[in-house]
Amino acid sequence: MKLNQTIPISLIYFLLTIFLCFFGVSTTNAAEKTNSILKVENFFKNLKTLEADFIQVSPSGKTSEGKIFLDLPGKLRIDYNQPNNILITSKGFWIVIQNRKLKSTNNIPLNQTPFSILLENKINFNNKDLIVDLEKILGIIVLKIKLAENKQAGELILEFSEKPFLLKKWIIRDLVGDETTVLIQNAKYNQKLPFTIFFPDDFPEPNN
């Protein structure tokens, strides 16, 4: 007798989930995690400056492009291409967010943002102030970092290729789970950057 049975959709999703768990995400033991975390620390220890193009994907799926500059420790510039009018800078202590079209400036304490993790004077993930988790997904090292005492800052997720060991992407996940993804392209490492690029724009005072 021939049986004609339809496999439930829920069972198909369940089997796909099991497949991805076993074949997509590598099991990472404690020693492997420690070794990979040390690799990330060494990457930032040896990173003096970074200049790169980026593509940003917002939680709604909207994309923006621009240039990013890092000069560690402490200095950051994220300069968006038009039609995005946003400029983000930091020289330590504050993140300055400016809208060039509106000529507006907002200052946010650095330690209230995930950027504080990247801009530390000495990055140490074996730190009671951080909650750190690591996994490998299809050959990509994924490091998830939260500030233990400031959950309002959200979560920073760093993704690295293994060979060569390079930063490819970071994701900022907020308290409600919305993610902003930044893809790094055409990176140049450890080249001298002018200090002045980390200053915010100087908008003229409005006329009374």
Where are these regions (language model features)?
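Solvent-exposed strand-loop boundary residues in beta-sheet-rich modules
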Residues: 58-60, 101-103, 176
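Bacterial N-terminal signal peptides
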Residues: 12-24
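Bacterial N-terminal signal peptides that target proteins for export
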Residues: 2-15
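A short, Trp-centered hydrophobic/proline-enriched beta-strand micro-motif
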Residues: 42-61
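Boundary at the C-terminal end of the N-terminal hydrophobic targeting segment
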Residues: 28-32
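Gly/Pro-enriched, hydrophobic low-complexity segments
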Residues: 126-207
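Short, solvent-exposed helix-to-loop capping segments enriched in aromatics
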Residues: 44, 112-126
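An acidic-aromatic
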Residues: 67-117, 180
